[in-house]
């Protein structure tokens, strides 16, 4: 399930666009996640009160959390699949503290791909989308494996 060097290059090139505005991209990803899958909002006590897209866009806390999420993911993607330590740490917090099901990682992966394509259509074509999809699937599979080790049925 690994990615070729060329696929990793596509992933990292696309991620370079994210790094120009991590917080803005992160906020858009979370808005897409929460509006597309409102049940995910229930896992975030800090954001449960945000009912509309306008409220979400106005939330500095949501923007900060989006920055945190995409900064962590960027660090993982840059490891090109050699992310065992990072995934272990992330899985521990997401299983034990936050109780985030693997399905929600699928939802946010879809949101990331949607936002990247919407914001950067000329730099995020079918090849880049496919590579990013594979990279995010690798991440999710490794998170799921770590969840199993931790005994989390997420």
Curated annotation (Swiss-Prot):
Species of origin: Cervus elaphus (Red deer)
Annotated ranges, domain Globin: 2-148
Reactions catalysed according to its record: Fe(III)-heme b-[protein] + nitric oxide + H2O = Fe(II)-heme b-[protein] + nitrite + 2 H(+); H2O2 + AH2 = A + 2 H2O
Modification Phosphothreonine occurs at: 68
Disulfides per UniProt: none
EC primary class: oxidoreductase
InterPro entries according to UniProt: Globin, Globin-like_sf, Myoglobin
GO cellular component terms, A-Z: extracellular exosome; sarcoplasm
Binding-site positions, O2: 65
Keywords, comma-separated and alphabetical: Cytoplasm, Heme, Iron, Metal-binding, Muscle protein, Oxidoreductase, Oxygen transport, Phosphoprotein, Transport
Annotated protein name in UniProt: Myoglobin
Gene: MB
Residue positions where Phosphoserine is found in the record: 4
Function of the protein: Monomeric heme protein which primary function is to store oxygen and facilitate its diffusion within muscle tissues. Reversibly binds oxygen through a pentacoordinated heme iron and enables its timely and efficient release as needed during periods of heightened demand. Depending on the oxidative conditions of tissues and cells, and in addition to its ability to bind oxygen, it also has a nitrite reductase activity whereby it regulates the production of bioactive nitric oxide.
Gene Ontology biological-process entries: removal of superoxide radicals
Positions with a binding annotation for nitrite: 65
Subcellular location: Cytoplasm, Sarcoplasm
Binding site for heme b: 94
Oligomeric form and interacting partners: Monomeric.
Primary subcellular site in the record, as a coarse category: cytoplasm
Name of one Pfam family that matches: Globin
Single GO molecular function: oxygen binding
